[in-house]
Amino acid sequence: MEQERNYTNGDYKRLGRRIRKEPDNIAQEDYQMLQDLRIANKSALAATFKALHHAALKIDKDSVCTYRIKRIESIISKLIRFQDMEAQRIADIAGCRCIMTSEENVMALYEHLKKKENKLPFIIRSEKNYIESPKENGYRSIHLNVQTKEPPLKVVEIQLRSLDQHNWATLVEISDVLFQSKLKEFGDKENPDLYEFHRLLAKRDSELTLSDKKKISEISGKYQYLERIGTLFTENHLNLRAQRNKLKTSRNAPFLLISTDKEGKPELKDFSNFDDAEIAYFETFLNNPENKNIVLTHFKNTTFDKISIAYSNYFMTYNETLFRILNSIADVSVYAFNNYKIGEFKKNYKAFWFILSKWFGNKQKEVGLYNEDKNIRKSNKKKKEWTSSITSNVAKVNRIIANMCQGFSSNIWHYFMKRKRTRLEKELASKGYLFFNEKISNTQLLLCKKK
């Protein structure tokens, strides 16, 4: 790595003026200055991450912690949007994110960081608790601006959120890519439907009313939301899984360079050390004719699923919120059936099975790829990781199906199952899947491939 360059406040003021004056014609030297600003956060970010990761694991062994340095194009965008801002004073150039499995664990980590501040390598300068006071669109998270105690004194933004809160936030960004809804930038101005859709999904499960679920089901159907996202996720998941199986992705290669094209197709490279990773990031940024979205991030002892969760807005391979949408459609189906609203029942029930016919077809495709992947045979860890992922997802969907069947009024439901099958259940059977429900009362339900 080249020797560190030093810049004055005046240098940064002049940099901001040059960028605002000609944002489409930024000089190579100015890009280099922005890159130097990024890597100047190296030691502060590493120290903050180490302490945060250690604290998070004590509270939640399944927590996911990452760090990243703000992308060059994001710094430029911020300088243009905020005319008086100086590059070196942007508070979130360096950032850590910790995703906990529950909101209770988020609050436990938050309290721990405040209580143990005297033993940590940073002090908390300011905080915003969007869990106690969510944003209007439903966003929930805790943001801490911390400053390192040891020179060079740097500010790092820490985000603490639960898995559900993270899934929601990343799904908003995925919707913006897939539907050009601009929710993150313009709220409900460009697409009121999808804004309301995500606002409702931001609620906790216990807060969702039947009316909310009906609206979620209605908007999902209008945009074929689960079908379109499901297709994209499957393609990207299989592509990324194959790439990941070729990588080292060990303790010796914790830096991941992610690039995503306009269609949401990701590419992945890994690096053993910070300097090599940053050189690759900067070279990729400068030589990017396809205008790919590029981010460099750091993980520690991670798995494919954790990578997919932490950066699902880049990878577009997986998001648990989709199961919540499917649950809403199932609940509306049950309500309509039990209350003799036949038209509403048929619409939602057919949508439910149409979505699942595609979903199980995609899972079958994934199993086929697993069987064909030569790289997977070299690693028992990757084998176990992949099979566990498939099994877990199938189990989640089967639970949704079982819970839906249990919710139907038994006598009416048995009569219905004897006398009538929807066209889409027949379509599912024609693709080779059998639907068993002999013991509905015990929710003994199975979807399997015909022999």
Positions of PLM-derived features:
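An acidic, glycine-/histidine-flanked metal-binding catalytic module
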Residues: 1-41, 152-260, 269
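Surface-exposed, low-hydrophobicity interaction/linker segments
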Residues: 24-81, 266
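Short, flexible, solvent-exposed loop/turn segments with mixed acidic/basic and small polar residues
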Residues: 80-91, 257-258, 283-288
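Helix N-cap motif at beta-to-alpha junctions
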Residues: 101-105
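Short Gly/Thr-rich strand-loop-strand
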Residues: 113, 119-148
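A short, exposed loop/beta-hairpin motif centered on an aromatic-Gly-Thr core
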Residues: 265-274, 294-297
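A short, charged, amphipathic alpha-helix used as a generic interaction element across diverse proteins
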Residues: 273-289
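Short, mixed-charge low-complexity intrinsically disordered segments
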Residues: 290-337
